[in-house]
């Protein structure tokens, strides 16, 4: 019914959010390899006996130190094994959601027997690349994912090529919902959020439900670095104030703790990342509760947060040396500012201050310490909002911040796309030397 009230640009915004904001169980880089392994295993009739896998340096970086849900183990080999033995390829980023205890035990046994090998794909021109080749007797199947965590581009078996993606991705990108973001602005996004029918964006409330549940789990259990629960204890000791700023810090940290610690609960992801989804969601939820927002106001604030985060991240490589919790928190800053005064200038100033504050934070792979960066980014977002509410912000006379927010965003993203590529290589070299 509401479709007739929505212009094509708004429809593209909605589709972009639906495309980029999805449930994901487990860190999405090892999950991408698990999906490749599951899809390959689905092509075979017999039991998988051995797995060879190849990944890009960036995917290796983000898969080396993170816990795979339900296994208590870290790394890409267990993800590949569990994907092949217990994964559901049709479930996308939730490929491991129905993996049984037996599948986990069998996957661990496969690793112990030395039947899983994960190697760097060399040479590799793709930032996000995962390939799994699984064997059953004399049969084998190989699945390749490129560009996005679930983008299967080729399926091949010992009998021949089953599927190959058409090579027209660049042309399709220009007219896709995400491609449209290259030709829009934050002002247009804000106008959309203010006027779009509530029923058209009600679905975004699922982000609050899923990421809110992760936050509660993080406070209940001892997940990851248990930053959220530790800070909550310090509140009880009188070492932290029990105020709105602390609530944002604790509840956002707790969700990331659970996520990175291997809790078997899905996150609502953003731009292929659970932590980005958490960062774009939980701070906005906390402020919405504080101001007594109803479901419609919460949905509009979450839509602004997630769409702003996607808008910024779309100008970045899918994976890079820049910690994207920072850009997701820029979306959160927009959502929180909207809840309080709704002014474009407040939103723009908050994002500019964020760029002047945390834009140098590096991504050194997915791990429990991501929760530290998530909490830092969420705190910086709230600080930037408080400054903006008093008409104070980092100005265009300082650093990489420009005189308008769109140029500030462009400046930040150009760093990640160009000069930080060398930083990324250095990070991967350091991490690889530790592995040996």
From Swiss-Prot:
Q: Which superkingdom, per the lineage?
A: Bacteria
The protein's GO terms of the molecular function aspect are: L-cysteine desulfhydrase activity
Record-level GO BP terms:
L-cysteine catabolic process to pyruvate
Record Pfam families: SDH_alpha
Q: State the InterPro entries in the record.
A: Ser_deHydtase-like_asu (IPR005130), UPF0597 (IPR021144)
Family classification:
Belongs to the UPF0597 family.
HAMAP family on file: UPF0597
**UniProt name for this protein:** UPF0597 protein YhaM
